[in-house]
Amino acid sequence: MLFSDFCKILDKIEKTTKRLEKTDYFVELIDFIKTSEKPENLKQVSQITIGRVFAEFENKEIGIGPNLLLEAVKTTGIPEKDLKSKIKETGDIGTAVENLSSNIKQVSLFSQALTLEEVYSTLKKLSEIEGNSSQKKKTRIISNLLILADPVESRYISRLILEDMRIGMNIPTILASFSNYFNVNKESVEKIYAVTNDIGLLGEKLISGSDIENDPELKLKVFRPIKPMLAQLTPSIEDAMIETKMPQFETKYDGARVQVHKSNGDVKIYSRRLENITNSVPELVEEIKKLDIDNIILEGECVAMDLDSGKPRPFQDILRRFRRKYNIDKMAEKIALRIYFFDVLYYNRGLIDTPLKTRREILEKLFGTNNWDSELEKIKKEIFSSKMLFSSFKLNSGDPNLVKEFFNWSLSIGHEGIMIKNPDAPYTPGSRVKTMYKVKPTLENLDVVVTRAKIGMGKRKDWYGSYELSVKDNDGNLHVIGNVGSGLTEDDLEKLTKIVNEIKIEDLGEEVILEPKIVLEVTYEEIQTSEKYEMGYALRFPRVVQIREDKSINDINTLDDVKKIYEIERNRK
């Protein structure tokens, strides 16, 4: 498939704002591929359309930032001054390169047109280049690719290198297109994507005529992590109990979500972003290897513990462990980790369609019970033990007074609150469900992405000291909700400034526009209505709690979350 044919349809998709039209254009693209010589190209097309070369679970990136891309573009013959001016004018490096493509060095008239396979394989190679001269090699490869591209191709190649296509396409739209073209149930393709995290594989299977409902490659598999199921925020324990009828109560831990996979004695541990963190937590791996269980996927919360106080250490200590690459054993001696397991998703077969109560029974057979209402003394001893693997603390009673007592006890031992779960519910990967609720004592902190940064003043003049914060809507579009500068230490500012310089897209002098890659957890006094921002809401007195290196733009809060918190707080007043 010629890359130019692909880009023509991408251009159509980009020019419409209507979701149904985007779906129709992608259906047109599928039909074009279906009748081509290589229908398997749908795999690459599906991934590229959302700005990815690798499947999400592979945890790989092209690894090229805006600065390196700019260097590569300059070597094609485009003057740096013109390039920066055009980026400032258009707000997009892809459009800037397209508009200035007449400056790109010409190649032989007899050179062949770029194919989809060539572009795809070239970009995959970029992620594999390492070593002292890697920057030069990457620059040369990108430059050669742009020299071979026509103007529209150069727009999309530039964006794909930054993994941001800017055409308004997302996974749900591609899944809707699959459903329409292949005449398959939309819920089926959504569920299969949820257990594979591989839109390319799903497209490849559909176009080859596979029976996707029964294809073993499209089932939940060990060592292919899935996105976690997410809880709803609830205004009160009472409201959540009404929604979940005969609920199950568990402690909400102050830690980091992890997924543990084990098969044939091999163990891998993944973060909520599906990152493989196995090498960073060797002591946990060794403990899991000792268990007489195999062919299993477990989910739990990894907590950094202070064994003297029996309370969790700061969340940043967990991130220090997850990010550590050297002297891991020494760090393990300083920061003790444990996992509280609260779900089993696979045990010799997929379990996500079975009720939570059944999954919990399996979990308790493996790790024992931790029933707060009948085993509190045992739990108290375990809190101070050096044991690393537990089942989560659970309350079996629905007595409102006991539930409140359990909630307060969970807070007293340093955790965040409680979870309220429907015991009859299945596990729905990657979705925020109405069968699981979190109850916390204070306003819910928000995870937001930084979209702009501004140079600081006074003591902060050497760093970016103020950050524009955004949340996303259901289509993935970003909406500004405020600016923050408080809560950041000098170490934080230094770290953020370094990242900003690597991901800035446009320089406006004292302010820069960024790729949406920095996630901050912020607290605030309240959410208020505001005409200043398009979304109609703003954070009052936001303050940074921590830099969430364990989260990506996929994990940030949504506009709906903001509206819900606003309504909850308004009803409390």
From Swiss-Prot:
Binding locations of ATP: 250, 257, 272, 301, 342, 432, 438
SUPFAM superfamilies the UniProt entry points to: ATP-dependent DNA ligase DNA-binding domain (SSF117018), DNA ligase/mRNA capping enzyme, catalytic domain (SSF56091), Nucleic acid-binding proteins (SSF50249)
Signal sequence range: none
GO molecular function, one term: metal ion binding
Keywords: ATP-binding, Cell cycle, Cell division, DNA damage, DNA recombination, DNA repair, DNA replication, Ligase, Magnesium, Metal-binding, Nucleotide-binding
Gene3D superfamilies, A to Z: DNA ligase, ATP-dependent, N-terminal domain (1.10.3260.10), DNA ligase/mRNA capping enzyme (3.30.470.30), Nucleic acid-binding proteins (2.40.50.140)
Catalytic activity: ATP + (deoxyribonucleotide)n-3'-hydroxyl + 5'-phospho-(deoxyribonucleotide)m = (deoxyribonucleotide)n+m + AMP + diphosphate
EC number: 6.5.1.1
Protein name per the record: DNA ligase
Native species: Methanococcus maripaludis (strain DSM 14266 / JCM 13030 / NBRC 101832 / S2 / LL)
